[in-house]
Amino acid sequence: MRKASQNPLQGQVAIVTGAGRGIGSAIARELAGLGAVTVLCGRGSKLLEETAKLIADSGGQAKVVACDVTDLSSVESVAARVKRDFGRADILVNNAGIGSFASPLHQLPPDSWEKVMNTNLRGVYYCIRSFAPMMIDARSGHIVNISSLAGKNALPNGAVYSASKWGLNGLSYSVAEELRSHNIRVSVICPGSVHTKLSPHEGKDPQKMLQPEDVAHVVAMLVTQAPQSFVSEVLLRPTLKP
């Protein structure tokens, strides 16, 4: 039986995108609590600093780095900084995402389509493209993509969000096969309704929805899995139907 450790991620570096609030903040705090140095990426420096303070107050380590995942040069700059400062990238959590749930597809403005796809899909591609080489060189690493059950089901008035998450699931499965020979694990989490500002939860009981911490616990489970195996996909649902 594998011995449990209080700090199983001690010495590891975890990059979390969209770490300023909601699911991303919860994931960053969870990984820091397990001993990882967390690199907090996002566009809102104030929110990132708030997450960093929560981590520091709990005895963890965090570094705030401004990053726009839709801008390749911005992501590459963060990867270069991580390599310079730490020399490694053990965990990459692609969490940054936006939604659009206000109209059917035929009424959706083209710029709304572009914004969602650029963040939810192109941004993940940019991050994997920038950080995977470090993992390949180290022959070790774990990439966790935060998708959605909307990437498994139809979502009326949310077609672009659903399409971006279906695409993210396909990307995740393919990259998992591409990187397995390099000893790199790729997992995708598909949560149901999570009580965050992104989720369209009007009329739903928050007590019956997933909380950001629920997703964070799953990330922790994945990245502390014994190295000879990995969980490729997790479908996460609230126990009680909202």
Feature-to-residue mapping (PLM):
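Active-site helix of classical SDR
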Residues: 128, 164
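C-terminal helical subdomain
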Residues: 181-184, 188-189, 204-242
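Substrate-binding pocket helix/loop in short-chain dehydrogenase/reductase
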Residues: 103-105, 112-114
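Conserved glycine-rich cofactor-binding loop
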Residues: 13, 20-22
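The beta1-alpha1 cofactor-binding region of Rossmann-like NAD(H)/NADP(H)-dependent oxidoreductases
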Residues: 66-78, 110
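Residue(s) in the substrate-gating loop at a strand-loop-helix junction
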Residues: 148
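Conserved glycine-rich Rossmann-like NAD(P)H-binding loop of the short-chain dehydrogenase/reductase
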Residues: 34-50
